[in-house]
Design a protein with these regions (language model features):
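N-terminal secretory signal peptides that target proteins for export/translocation
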Residues: 1-8
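N-terminal prosegments of processed precursors
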Residues: 13-15, 20, 25-147, 278-280
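Fold-level signature of zinc-dependent metallopeptidase catalytic domains
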Residues: 39-43, 51-54, 164-320
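The catalytic-center signature of Zn2+-dependent metalloproteases
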Residues: 258-275, 323-408
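A recurrent domain-boundary module in secreted/ectodomain proteins
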Residues: 410-449, 514-519
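Conserved "repeat-terminator" motif of extracellular CCP/Sushi domains
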Residues: 449-454, 502-521
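Short, solvent-exposed loop/edge segments of extracellular or virion-exposed proteins
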Residues: 453-468, 497
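Surface-exposed interfaces of beta-sheet-rich extracellular modules
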Residues: 474-502
């Protein structure tokens, strides 16, 4: 059984920020690379004062220039490091795992040095632009999730620029009601189609699901600006791709564009999903249908704002019947970072169901069993009631528990607790369904993507932090894992030999080949 490379714990509270002033929150590492203090601004919370999850806070000046080293190129080799000082007794060094560039947003991903089960995210918009003036809509997003505690920074309104830093206990965040099972009555009586014999996604042929993401004016109001919403959407994109990779699913989503829906009606997720799914609905559905037709994307998701309600809704194929009309999801803005909800709602588009306890509460007569796409396509709550998979609900735990950013898989464990069994294995199902959903439509616009061919000799294996093919400029971390009695001897990158380090980072400026060479220890 494989322990999680990064068990994503509970709520990764990513926050958007509008700018920074002079706080060297991040200092240079031994690599000679320096970075800056993160500053984040989230939606000015309407009246939400601090909840019980906030343990302490402080306000500091911020400086934008310190972040610009994150805009520099990344050479092949061992990952770079940055040190963050959140409080006098809270300093951490983060190891670089990847960089994604999406329509002007650069998202830096990493983990705490020596703690691959943690996550540190820095997202930049407008910071890497050249010139002496600060562009409008500059956004920085930063979060450090150590599991039991989460640190984040949030910019405050006004000038000079200042930021609020908080330490939070995610276990004290309030639970939200499960989303409804978005299944039509006719689908429940349709003939069953077996997925047996379907070609699964593989590391040699990973699936890419193309997505366009919309958002509502209420989401913009909640976030503070449209740029902050877009920033957080790309943060959530990275998190879902990590969830797929960490669950052994060779697939990814690619959000090729975003748009403001202009929708000012009821933001309740079930209402919006019904409208979004209807191509004749003039408020949401007709625009979504037109975007799919024009761009050839597989899925449409829309970010709304419904504090205190069900945090999303996603089209759910049932009984093995996948159809490109089942291509829509609605996700609450706060839930994107609160509990990885983009991966949950799009997980429904992949045919993945909740955990069995939640399903039994939602459908007490047990008829949900007949809707499953495979007998094992359900989420998981660990036997110690402390962790759930991405499709399960913490509200169904019998004690406070954390949602991990992975799909149920009996081959994964956290703190010795299996994250699935043979009857609850959403990752296995996703390996079958991601190629189906990726084949709903074919892109009608040019989209350059580069392949990274990974190889290894006998005696070990390699895997990327997220699967490709990759957009130009993406930085991908690749990790080597020796088998028992073996060790890593060298990396061969595009025909050149490099020394052995457990992790190397590759910049996808072209197609590349990387091979790990293992020898007996």
């Amino acid at each position: 059984m494989t322990p999680l490379r990064r068990p994503r714990r509970s709520r990764l509270l990513a926050l958007c920020v509008t700018a920074m002033a002079a706080l060297p929150l991040v200092s240079a590492s031994g690599t000679g690379v320096s970075a800056a203090a993160p500053a984040v601004t989230r939606a000015p919370s309407p009246s939400d004062g601090d909840g019980p999850e906030v343990l302490r806070d402080r306000t500091v000046p911020l400086a934008l220039d310190d972040f610009r080293t994150l805009c520099t190129g990344v050479p092949f080799g061992a990952p770079r490091e940055w040190t963050f000082d959140f409080f006098d007794n809270a300093r951490l060094t983060a190891v670089e795992d990847g960089i994604d560039d999406d329509g002007g947003t650069r998202t830096w991903s990493g983990h705490v040095k020596g703690r691959p089960d943690t996550s540190v995210i820095v997202s930049l918009r407008g910071v890497c632009s050249t010139g002496g003036t600060q562009p409008e809509g500059t956004v920085v997003e930063v979060v450090a999730d150590l599991g039991e505690h989460v640190y984040h920074l949030e910019t405050l309104p006004g000038r000079p620029l200042r930021a609020r830093i908080t330490e939070e206990d995610p276990a004290k965040q309030p639970h939200h009601a499960p989303d409804e099972l978005a299944v039509s009555p006719s689908a429940r009586t349709a003939p069953r189609h077996s997925l047996a014999g379907r070609a699964a996604a593989t590391s040699q042929n990973p699936a890419v699901i193309d997505v366009i993401a919309g958002y509502t004016p209420l989401a913009v109001q909640r976030a503070g600006s449209a740029q902050q919403v877009v920033n957080t959407i790309h943060w959530a994109e990275r998190k879902m791709n990590e969830a797929l990779a960490d669950s052994g699913v060779p697939a990814s989503i690619d959000i090729i564009g975003t748009y403001n829906t202009g929708y000012t009606g009821n933001n309740t997720s079930s209402v919006m999903w019904s409208k979004l799914s209807n191509p004749n609905d003039y408020e949401l559905g007709s625009t979504a249908a037109d975007l799919r037709r024009r761009y050839g994307v597989d899925l449409i998701t829309v970010v709304n704002s419904v504090p205190g309600q069900s945090s999303g809704q996603g089209s759910l194929p049932v009984r093995g019947n996948f159809d490109d009309s089942l291509a829509f999801s609605v996700v609450d803005y706060d839930s994107l970072t609160g509990w990885y909800n983009l991966g949950h709602e799009i997980g429904h588009n992949l045919g993945l169901f909740h955990d069995r306890r939640t399903l039994s509460q939602q459908v007490p007569d047990g008829s949900w069993v007949n809707d499953l796409n495979t007998p094992y396509g359900t989420g998981w709550i660990t036997s110690d009631e402390e962790h759930t998979s991405l499709m399960a609900y913490a509200s169904s735990c019998r004690q406070p528990c954390r949602t991990e950013n992975v799909y149920s898989d009996p081959g994964l464990s956290i703190y010795g607790q299996p994250l699935g069994n043979e009857s609850n294995d959403n990752a296995r199902l996703a390996r079958l369904t991601t190629p189906i959903v990726a084949g709903y439509r074919a892109l009608t616009v040019a989209r350059t993507r580069y392949a990274l061919t990974l190889e290894s000799s006998e005696g070990g294996s390699v895997r990327p932090a997220v699967y490709g093919p990759y957009k130009p400029g993406t930085v991908v971390a690749v990790t080597a894992t020796p088998a028992s009695g073996h060790r890593l001897a060298a990396w061969i990158y595009d025909g050149r030999q490099y020394g052995p380090t457990e992790q190397v980072n590759v910049t996808m400026d072209a197609a590349h080949t990387l091979r790990a060479v293992f020898i007996e220890a």
